[in-house]
UniProtKB/Swiss-Prot annotation:
Subunit composition and interactions: Homooligomer, probably a homooctamer. Interacts with HDAC2 and HDAC3, but not HDAC1. Interacts with SALL4. Interacts with SMARCA5/SNF2H, BAZ2A/TIP5 and USP21. Interacts with the nucleosome remodeling and histone deacetylase (NuRD) repressor complex. Interacts (via BEN domains 1 and 3) with ERCC6L (via N-terminal TPR repeat); the interaction is direct.
GO molecular function: rDNA binding
Gene: Bend3
Locus of motif Nuclear localization signal: 54-56
Descriptive protein name: BEN domain-containing protein 3
Major subcellular location class: nucleus
Region annotated Disordered, chain positions: 1-35, 52-122
Bilayer-spanning residue ranges: none
Pfam families: BEN (PF10523)
Organism field: Mus musculus (Mouse)
Length: 825
């Protein structure tokens, strides 16, 4: 096809469309002033048309034909008609013409002139040449296949008669811009890209609308807040009928409670037992976990708070509610499900009771081998219950553990008894397989960590766990190798390494008072190894001593050893004997410790070394520096901190209890490592009255607490009824003082554990407890426990209990857990 054929096609188009020509002539008459600019536009279009016709000519010799000027002039009206039509239809209100043709202008190039029937109309994504104003229309009006411009209708009407000049005009425009013939795949990509941009524009518009609505809502909320008075901020909350308690029911629960936090926990169990059950609850979900499904909602808390406010009006203060009730509720609820998660993760699929592991019947023994074999075969099914520590064990561990590391070691003895039955086996293990050793069972180790994190929240951080607990467990396992003896030695349950002691030393077992206890359960009482000092040779120290007066004779060592409760207590008594100048009424020892740290003075290193010399003579493990540091240095520092005078020693001698002799029965199955248990620093045990609820010298019905003779803020004063309730729950006068501490210092017993920063006297770089409230505690102690030597009782029983209560973490209340156990059943 040459330029002459194109001009003839244009003539035919103009002849077949007289109405268009008339409209264009009318339009031209109204736009004479713009004729010059449009003529310039027309010339550029004809130039592009001429170049296109040259490229389309496949059989020509490459010489372009000249376009006659007459046919050029005959094309002017149609070209100008298209330009004017662009201006007329540029309004966004018109949707039947330009917007559609703007988004889908023209059609694709023809594959060949001989195949006109295969042409297909496809949208063009090039910008038209007839105005910048169409950029706005392109954004506002998406392309639509239903809306066809007159230009497209014209092309469809002439598709059977061959290519139209306007199609060639569009083709020439695309070629002028440097775009070649596009394939179907490219056009599909272009269409998807355009559709994506339209979707993005739509999303942007929706987001803008949402932001506008949010702004309107914020303004509305601000307006409403200005109209509501502060007294009306808390709306009236009417509980559903099934959650309403009668006055008698609420009174009964309140009488069993110790504080507002205790009452809140009891109400949680009473009102919402479904929160503690597994009904319709998918356990073992690896995606969400247990805590994601179980949580206290605001309506739960609001209902509980309403009931608590009836008996504790101060809870209406939000600060009191958040400080005294909310932390206890969250702590109790989270610990419940944390332990439930540990139980449900046990192997074998057996889920044991959450609150209390099944106790072994003391009267149940194996009568024959058949039963024993049956039990061994069924042992795999009961392994889950062996990995659950009951509440009583946890209470004992917490009472005696002075740090998270010690608590973890106690659990290690409980959950890994096989390592302590065979001592040489224990030294082959470490927490995570460090140092080429075998790794402990990850499941049981995770149980230890979970329990530790519950009672010591600071251990939830990985670094704290590794430094304080994992390292302490590794030290315990490493220490087993020191006491394991020779390779061929049979496993023992004795307290010390008998192979390293003289031949005349025998081992006294613990009295059998715990029939039927689980392996790993430890006793509170451990007796020292009896030693025949007549046959014992005491070597002279291999280091210089400042004077011979510090050396002890065999009789002195015998006397100190026989009056000691444990090897740690023996070291403490040596400290008292070798540093007499510190143990006077001035209590100068409070200014000293073994290392001189914490701003204190260092004890005489020579005499400390002499103490170690005597200790390792009777306890060879003390030769290891790590064992000495972990087991004895802390006890010596504790002995320096503790209040003690000659009066204390005489007071303890008066209350000393007879220790059973060698007639104690052997407990051959006692499979634990007793020497690692925490020794009693506080001197000989107190008489049975300390462990009974009858310590109160006055009948409770006749108990009347006089008013204090010193000024006390009214919130801290307790009624006679409250004092009687605390007395009923106390086990001793020291425990009574500790419970009063919790009652009168509520701000210290929260999840923040601020009490760890305090003690009675403010020693050891700690803060001192409020003297007024401490004086009030003593006032109540004197009213309940009137004795002649109240000063001794206060200093030797109450103050240590108060300081110990500040050191140890919160524990679960057993009575609450028992009730929760009933609810779960």
């Amino acid at each position: 096809m040459n330029s002459t054929e194109i001009s003839e096609d244009v003539e035919e188009v103009l002849k077949n469309n007289p109405v268009k020509a008339e409209g264009s002539d009318a339009t031209l008459d109204c736009s004479r002033n713009s004729r010059a600019s449009e003529k310039h536009l027309l010339e550029s279009v004809l130039t592009a048309l001429h170049d296109s016709s040259k490229r389309k000519q496949l059989d020509s010799d490459g010489q372009p034909d000249s376009v006659p000027s007459v046919k050029r002039r005959r094309l002017i009206p149609e070209a100008l008609l298209a330009g004017m039509r662009t201006r007329e239809n540029s309004s966004p209100c018109q949707g039947n013409g330009e917007p559609a043709s703007r988004g889908r202008s023209g059609s694709c190039a023809w594959p060949a002139e001989e195949e006109p029937s295969t042409e297909a109309t496809v949208p063009s994504y090039k910008k038209p040449l007839y105005g910048i104003s169409h950029k706005i229309m392109e954004k506002k009006n998406p392309p639509s296949g239903d809306l066809l411009s007159p230009y497209e209708l014209f092309e469809k009407a002439n598709s059977s008669s061959g290519p139209s000049p306007l199609r060639l005009l569009s083709e020439s425009q695309k070629r002028e811009c440097g775009v070649g013939v596009a394939t179907d795949g490219d056009l599909n990509i272009y269409f998807l890209i355009q559709k994506m941009f339209y979707m993005l524009n739509g999303l942007t518009t929706n987001m803008s609308q949402l932001h506008s609505k949010m702004d309107l809502l914020s303004l509305e909320v601000s307006r409403v807040k200005k109209q509501v008075s502060p007294s009306e901020l808390v709306a009236k909350f009417q509980p559903p009928p099934e959650y309403q308690l009668t006055a008698s029911e609420l009174k009964q629960i309140a009488e069993q409670s110790l504080s507002c936090g205790d009452l809140a926990c009891r109400l949680l169990l009473q009102l919402f037992p479904e929160l503690f059950s597994d009904v319709d609850f998918s356990r073992g979900c690896s995606a969400c976990g247990f805590a994601a499904k179980r949580k206290l909602e605001s309506l739960h808390l609001q209902l509980i708070r309403n009931y608590v406010e009836v008996y504790y009006p101060n809870v209406k203060d939000t600060a009191v509610w958040q400080a005294e009730c909310l932390p206890q509720l969250n702590d109790f609820f989270s610990r419940f499900w944390a332990q439930r998660e540990m139980e449900d993760s046990q192997p074998g699929g057996q889920v044991t009771n959450f609150f209390e592991a099944d106790q072994v019947d003391a009267g149940h023994f194996l009568d024959n081998k058949d039963q024993e074999e049956a039990l061994s075969l069924d042992r795999s099914s009961t392994i889950a219950s062996d990995h659950v520590v009951d509440t009583q064990d946890l209470t004992e561990f917490l009472d005696e553990a002075s740090s998270p590391g010690e608590f973890a070691v106690f659990l290690l003895h409980r959950l890994f008894p096989e390592l302590f039955d065979h001592r040489k086996l224990g030294e082959q293990y470490s927490c995570y397989g460090d140092g080429g050793k075998q790794e402990l069972d990850p499941q049981r180790l995770q149980i230890i960590r979970n329990y530790t994190e519950i009672y010591f929240p600071d251990m939830q951080e990985e670094e704290a766990w590794l430094q304080q607990c994992a390292q302490r467990i590794n030290d315990e396992l490493e220490g087993l190798g020191l006491e394991g003896g020779s390779e061929g030695e049979a496993p023992r349950d004795d307290c010390y390494d008998s192979s390293s002691l003289p031949d005349d030393i025998s081992v006294v077992k613990v009295e059998d008072n715990f029939e039927g206890e689980r392996p790993g359960r430890r006793s509170k009482k451990i007796w020292l190894v009896p030693i025949d000092f007549d046959k014992l040779e005491i070597p002279q120290p291999d280091f210089e001593m400042p004077g011979s007066d510090c050396l002890l004779s065999k009789e002195q060592l015998r006397s100190i050893y026989e009056s000691s409760l444990s090897i740690g207590n023996f070291a403490s008594r040596l400290l008292v004997h070798l540093f007499p100048e510190l143990f006077t009424h001035e209590n100068l020892r409070k200014q000293y410790n073994c290392s001189g740290s914490l701003g204190k003075k260092q004890l005489d290193p020579a005499r400390i070394r002499l103490i170690r010399h005597y200790v390792q003579l009777l306890y060879p493990r003390a030769k290891n520096d790590r064992v000495w540091t972990l087991e004895f240095v802390g006890k010596l520092d504790e002995r320096c901190r503790r209040r003690d005078t000659e009066q204390r020693r005489s007071y303890q001698q008066q209350r000393k209890v007879h220790v059973p002799g060698p007639e104690c029965r052997d407990l051959a199955s006692y499979a634990i490592n007793p020497e690692r248990f925490r020794e009693e620093f506080e001197g000989p045990p107190l008489p049975p009255e300390r462990s009974s609820k009858d310590f109160c010298k006055i009948p409770l019905d006749e108990l009347v607490v006089p008013s204090p003779d010193f000024p006390v803020p009214s919130p801290y004063l307790l009624s006679d009824k409250e004092v009687r309730e605390i007395v009923q729950q106390s086990l001793s006068v020291g425990n009574f003082a500790a419970r009063l501490l919790v009652r009168l210092f509520p701000e210290l017993f929260t999840t923040e554990n601020l009490r760890l920063q305090y003690n009675h006297s403010g020693a050891c770089n700690k803060k001192q407890l409020d003297p007024t409230r401490l004086r009030l505690i003593r006032h109540y102690v004197e009213a309940v426990y009137p004795v002649e030597k109240m000063e001794e009782v206060w200093h030797y029983e109450c103050i240590p209990s108060i300081d110990e209560r500040c050191r140890r973490p919160n524990r679960k209340k057993c009575d609450i857990l028992k009730k929760a156990k009933k609810v779960e059943k």
